[in-house]
Amino acid sequence: MAGLSSSQIPDGEFTAVVYRLIRDSRYSEAVQLLSAELQGSPRSRAGLSLLAYCYYRLQEFELAAECYEQLSQMHPELEQYRLYQAQALYKACLYPEATRVAFLLDNPTYQTRVLRLQAAIKYSEGDLPGARSLVEQLLSGEGAEDSGGENDYDGQINLGCLLYKEGHYEAACSKFLAALQASGYQPDISYNLALAYYSSRQYAPALKHIADIIERGIRQHPELGVGMTTEGIDVRSVGNTIVLHQTALVEAFNLKAAIEYQLRNYEAAQEALTDMPPRAEEELDPVTLHNQALMNMDAKPTEGFEKLQFLLQQNPFPPETFGNLLLLYCKYEYFDLAADVLAENAHLTYKFLTPYLYDFLDAMITCQTAPEEAFIKLDGLAGMLTEQLRRLTIQVQDARHSRDDESAKKAVNDYDETLEKYIPVLMAQAKIYWNLENYPMVEKIFRKSVEFCNDHDVWKLNVAHVLFMQENKYKEAIGFYEPIVKKNYDNILSVSAIVLANLCVSYIMTSQNEEAEELMRKIEKEEEQLSYDDPDKKIYHLCIVNLVIGTLYCAKGNYDFGISRVIKSLEPYHKKLGTDTWYYAKRCFLSLLENMSKHTIMLRDSVIQECVQFLEHCELYGRSIPAIIEQPLEEERMHTGKNTVTYESRKLRALIYEIIGWNM
């Protein structure tokens, strides 16, 4: 029936055809027919009513509200149209307009429904006292003419939502559990419960309820194509149907992604997003779009920024969008853009940024022009947070001493949250001195924070780095690198390649060559196993370890051994040559060429020939490999022909020929 026009429908069959389309959930086609029919009969009550219904089912809430507004003007005696208009306006997030229309309803028949709607509006606007007052009216049975008062599980849900917004997550869980027991399984209530568990950092029960939602969704609605995209199966969009909304699958997968992301299981987080029912990008809801931007930021930063900037123009957008966009601008050092967004959106600053986050961003932006002033701002923030951490430490001790498990649990959660705020402030302070290469001062900053951070992986990793960079503290660096590596020894490729490389160098510099060789054998064995399982996968860990060791020998002046190590580390080229590995290799070659041009070193002809052959291989295999990863929002892009390993390897080869006087 696709493309059917009014003229093709036999006389007397129009209504039956429209109802069949609605029955089959083919609302878009019904809208086409009804819109055409209403051009001839614009005051048709039946036509407008059906059109409004179809728009509502298509989630075109503003258009539905317009239809209901026309109906309420044509038939002011039928107050249900005004109620439907208010509901559609609420769904369209037009809260002031929805409130205005709802206040016009004074029919006792609709009083309970109006109270529910007004409570929902106030809740969405963030007016929690106003929402609570209306919910309590409903629970007391006021305005109960049409439904006998708020039924038990509806009341529990409403109270649970209010408690959740107020930050009382445990109490919210109790309400949602009570509602679930009273109503039987409901996907939306299960999702609310999972969300409350997530917010109270109880990830295991949250994941249990998410798994339940997903399992039931797959079993009851196989047509929604859950997991198809992850499996690489090309499937068409399932659209934003009412059925999809009722399953709560989209919400469940987004929450699963958030939990995995918090647990640093980044691949699992990305998989959760691709597992959800397939939809076209223009059909994605704001939360999914926001999560896609965050999860894929490392691989597709330009797209990520575009999505977050787009969301900021929408009404509504996920409340985390504003802060995350600003933090990412700072991470990628777009401080001017962060400052512009803050200045242009002062009204969002007070609504979506906590005082802590605002002060942190302000200090980060100040770093660009006034690092000393920024350090003072960060120091003030750090002082406030350390006071909170000390106070919470005492609370934890007191609660444990009095065997108050509930208070102890809450204090521990609060401590962890405060520590997660403190670490970025500390790292921002350290980075100011790191950029000045004042490594002793960085070490001093870290030592001041040992009281709170000695068990934190990020802190331990950065302490290791700063000890390593001082070149006379390799033994101390080993003390911090080793636990990180041993913690993940059975899955050693999950450890950053630079951590493994720095540990190997530290072993070599402290004459622990056997330990270095053992670690490299372990990495090689893991890489061989991974290559066996996935022959096409590029793995760079051992390559980068060898490159860093080669760089070390070059830095010590032993270019014969160092350059040979660098060259061998990139074999086979089709698997080992990449942007990161080329970066390490070319640094050694540039250092070599600089010293050759100054005549401070002499190389054997065989080594020079080896260098030329290496660069020829890089030229051959590096045609599609970027020499550098450009900043995502760079206005002036490099010439695509110049930003390749091939181009840079030719340049280096030409320099070799020039220095040794060979004719090209």
Curated annotation (Swiss-Prot):
GO biological process: intraciliary transport
Subcellular compartments: Cell projection, Cilium
InterPro entries: TPR-like_helical_dom_sf, TPR_rpt, TT30
TPR repeat spans: 11-44, 45-78, 153-186, 188-220, 385-418, 423-456, 458-491, 543-576
Parts forming coiled coils: 507-534
Domain of life according to the entry: Eukaryota
Family statement drawn from the similarity comment of this UniProt entry: Belongs to the TTC30/dfy-1/fleer family.
Protein name listed in UniProt: Intraflagellar transport protein 70B
Name of the gene: Ift70b
